[in-house]
């Protein structure tokens, strides 16, 4: 039996990263893998919340992450379970550490793009182009984790399939936050302006259509019960990107027998990957 220690698995963002594996631990045991929090193990897994801090400078975050890893004995791997293809913060720690692998939920299918300068949805450490010019030196040890944000959301939840033949009141569901009622900040940076800017064109297009559209009234939230009532009653579920490319709505559309429309996912490399344009969603 191979034992894998989950370091600081109760820390919020670490818990999200480890959650799919914890829920599958009985299956993992069947193939000879045991998860543990004890001191006897073959490999240690270190998730991103233990080695990055978005509230300080990138340099300070990397230094703190490397200091944390100095206390790890034996072989270890780094897991970056964030819902973005960006490697900023974890990559810098990984390449200066003794980690065997960097496991990532999703990566750019064209790995050469990491060397060209992209922000990839993360600007906690500045808004300039983020280039990994030495990426090729480490790319063979940067691999997919076998999980992604869909697995995190649905870990331990039994999928319920609804009656597809039931009448649907709405043509399109646009039940996403817009506009923001109050400014939203994360790590001292405003997020709501970013969201509103790219969601406004979507709402503008929908408002011009002569269809019955389920949406929020001036961004005012509704109860969970009302939210799912409208979602289930929609023929089409429109799902713009959020912090990353995947969201619970992606699977809920299939559960509710609705057509999923979202931005193109063909540039994403992830596993499992249910996104097949023209079959499981429409780009």
Show where each model-derived region lies.
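Nucleotide-sugar donor-binding catalytic core of glycosyltransferases
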Residues: 2-34, 39-248, 255, 259-277
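Conserved acidic donor-binding segment of nucleotide-sugar-dependent glycosyltransferases
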Residues: 281-283
């Amino acid at each position: 039996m191979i034992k894998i220690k989950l370091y600081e698995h109760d820390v919020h963002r670490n818990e999200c990263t480890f959650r799919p594996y914890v829920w599958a631990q009985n299956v993992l045991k069947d193939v000879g893998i045991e998860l543990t929090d004890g001191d006897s193990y073959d490999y240690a897994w270190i998730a991103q919340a233990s080695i990055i801090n978005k509230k300080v400078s990138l340099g300070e975050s990397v230094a703190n992450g490397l200091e944390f890893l100095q206390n790890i004995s034996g072989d270890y791997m780094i897991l970056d379970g964030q819902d973005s293809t960006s490697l900023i913060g974890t990559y810098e720690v990984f390449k200066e550490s003794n980690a065997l692998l960097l496991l990532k939920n999703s990566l750019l299918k064209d790995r050469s793009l990491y060397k060209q300068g992209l922000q990839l949805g993360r600007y906690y450490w500045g808004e300039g182009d983020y280039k990994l010019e030495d990426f090729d030196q480490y790319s063979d040890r940067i691999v997919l984790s076998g999980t992604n944000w869909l697995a995190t959301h649905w870990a331990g939840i039994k999928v319920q399939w609804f009656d597809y033949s039931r009448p649907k009141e709405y043509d399109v569901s646009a039940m996403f936050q817009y506009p923001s009622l109050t400014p939203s900040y994360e790590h001292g940076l405003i997020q709501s302006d970013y969201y509103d800017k790219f969601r406004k064109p979507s709402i503008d297009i929908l408002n011009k259509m002569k269809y019955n559209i389920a949406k929020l009234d001036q961004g005012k939230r509704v109860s969970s019960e009302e939210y799912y009532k409208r979602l289930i009653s929609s023929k089409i579920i429109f799902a713009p990107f959020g912090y990353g490319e995947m969201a619970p709505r992606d699977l809920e559309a299939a559960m509710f027998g609705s057509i999923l429309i979202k931005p193109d996912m063909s540039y994403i490399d992830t596993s499992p990957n249910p996104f097949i344009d023209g079959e499981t969603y429409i780009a």
